[in-house]
């Protein structure tokens, strides 16, 4: 039975036969976002550089975002209402955030009527909810025991202030943690936005695990903030073996990623990558990142180097690529289950190619990029999650070879994912990747390609390449056991090819099986074409396509 028929059988027999309608519903969520890892083509320099990019399929969210829940507002038994009392004035005590006039507006103005105790409690309830809606999630209004004099009732507002602010855990990191909390002061009113931001920034520092609690303080209305931090492993990495390369650079590849936490300063990180394919293709990268200040900003610098000797019809061609990158990022928003970051990136790539031992071309690609990344988690019931990136870049390519593609271009690109739980063990994942460029004939460093293990999986890497295009993917996941899952997938994409501005549309369908634990993960995928188009980059025209990836953490 071929893959296409097998998918039909599974969909018909599955309790999730709503797959196709859900695809349409999911498509309504798409907005623009950035492309990662779908640009490897025969244009050699760009293809090598793109090997450093995380594949778009692996676009992942950040660490768990901090979340604070307000305690419930007290409810009172109406049977305790008792007799009514005439009220014509309310006295508010301890309010510093909102004025008397603002609070009266919330409760509907100065009362002049009889109130039961329950009705007075409802007034306090409105005030408490107003504070919490404005982010003061520990605030509450209470009506203390009192004698009503001159028809005036007193309402005490406990706005919720910081008591003691301190760190626990490894004492060596205490001063560094407290530097991030300096803006939070004892006796200041607790507001969710600045607190979540501080906790979120600390939680995202590499090489550490954090735990935070708010507990009753020494005074009424105060809460102590405790941040516990413990170091994790300061050296770790992974080995990845996959067959997702191109036939010119080598379909099979091995890649090692190593991360070090050197602690030159608190929160810094070194990343190193080494990769070798089944052909004569080597590449490496080293990068260093560190915080800027104590508000979540980070700076990163990287250098990469690759060498290659092509096979097949490009057998006489060899060369090397040297890349430089500088990046600054800053979290614009860290809130309850949502985050938005801005990134500014400058990049330069120098590509030198040799043909039969003689210099063929030297090409320089300079790029200035601004991007916005975002993540949003919704209710735990639906387990909805959306995350992605949007980038705008200007590029300038120069070459010493006559007739080579060069010049300036503006590129808008995007990558966005949505995960939606549709049953207890089933999740529908949908994804859109697109790119729009101001001109055609971009090299593969900036181009757009549909085929590959992270694109339309029924076609080989480099299939259908151009400057403008989009890719849509839909995956229906079903958890099998604690560490394994299987899913059906549908891929569809369109690209305007540089040669003659021809538009190509490709589609594929298939099955994927995954297994993972802390040390090992395995991904097996089999995809068959839905479109009639044959491959233009692989003479074998293999259909279906089989992809495999093994990842070992150490």
Which role does the model predict for each range below?
Residues 221-223, 250-254, 280-284, 320-324, ...:
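Residues that define the transmembrane beta-barrel architecture of outer-membrane proteins
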Residues 38-245, 274-282, 412, 432-433:
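Periplasmic polypeptide-binding modules associated with outer-membrane biogenesis and secretion
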Residues 258, 453, 513-522, 542-554:
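Outer-membrane beta-barrel "beta-signal"
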């Amino acid at each position: 039975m071929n893959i296409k028929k097998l998918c039909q059988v599974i969909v018909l027999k599955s309790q999730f036969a709503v797959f196709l309608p859900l695809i349409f519903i999911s498509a309504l969520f798409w907005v623009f976002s950035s492309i990662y890892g779908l640009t490897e083509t025969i244009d050699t320099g760009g293809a090598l550089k793109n090997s450093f990019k995380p594949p778009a399929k692996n676009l992942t969210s950040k660490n768990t975002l901090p979340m604070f829940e307000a305690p419930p507002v007290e409810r009172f038994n109406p049977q305790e209402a008792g007799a009514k009392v005439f009220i014509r004035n309310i006295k508010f005590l301890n309010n510093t955030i909102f004025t008397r006039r603002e609070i009266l507006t919330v409760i509907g103005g100065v009362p002049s009527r009889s109130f039961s105790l329950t009705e007075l409690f409802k007034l306090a309830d409105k005030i408490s909810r107003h504070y919490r809606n404005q982010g003061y999630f520990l605030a509450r209004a209470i009506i203390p025991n009192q004698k009503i004099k001159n028809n005036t009732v007193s309402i005490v507002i406990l706005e919720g202030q910081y008591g003691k602010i301190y760190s626990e855990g490894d004492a060596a990191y205490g001063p560094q943690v407290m530097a991030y909390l300096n803006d939070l002061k004892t006796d200041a009113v607790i507001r969710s936005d600045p607190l979540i931001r501080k906790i979120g920034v600390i939680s995202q520092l590499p090489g550490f695990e954090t735990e935070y609690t708010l507990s009753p303080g020494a005074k009424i209305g105060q809460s102590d903030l405790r941040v516990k931090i413990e170091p994790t492993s300061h050296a770790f990495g992974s080995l990845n073996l996959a067959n997702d390369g191109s036939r010119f650079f080598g379909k099979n590849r091995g890649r090692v990623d190593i991360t070090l936490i050197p602690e030159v300063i608190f929160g810094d990180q070194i990343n190193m990558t080494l990769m070798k394919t089944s052909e004569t293709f080597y590449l490496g990268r080293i990068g260093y990142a560190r915080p800027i200040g104590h508000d979540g900003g980070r700076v990163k610098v990287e250098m990469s180097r690759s060498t290659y000797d092509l096979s097949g019809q490009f057998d006489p061609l060899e060369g090397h690529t040297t890349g430089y990158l500088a990046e600054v990022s800053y979290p614009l928003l860290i809130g309850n289950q949502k985050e938005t970051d801005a990134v500014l990136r400058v990049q330069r790539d120098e590509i030198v190619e040799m043909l039969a031992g003689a210099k063929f071309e030297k090409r320089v690609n300079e790029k200035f990029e601004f991007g916005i990344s975002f993540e949003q988690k919704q209710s735990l019931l639906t387990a909805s999650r959306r995350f992605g990136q949007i980038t705008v870049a200007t590029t300038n390519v120069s070459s010493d070879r006559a007739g080579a593609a060069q010049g300036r271009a503006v590129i808008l690109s995007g990558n966005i994912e949505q995960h939606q739980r549709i049953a207890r063990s089933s999740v529908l994942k949908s994804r859109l990747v697109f790119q729009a460029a101001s001109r055609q004939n971009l090299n593969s460093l900036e181009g757009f390609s549909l085929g590959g293990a992270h694109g339309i999986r029924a076609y080989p890497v480099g299939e259908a390449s151009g400057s403008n295009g989009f890719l849509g993917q839909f995956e229906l996941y079903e958890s099998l056991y604690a560490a394994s899952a299987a899913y059906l997938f549908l891929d569809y994409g369109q690209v305007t090819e540089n040669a003659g501005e021809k538009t190509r549309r490709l589609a594929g369908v298939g099955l994927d099986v995954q297994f993972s634990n802390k040390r090992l993960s395995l991904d097996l995928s089999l995809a068959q074409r839905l479109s009639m188009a044959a491959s233009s980059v692989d003479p074998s025209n293999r259909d279906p396509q089989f992809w495999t990836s093994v990842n070992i953490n150490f």
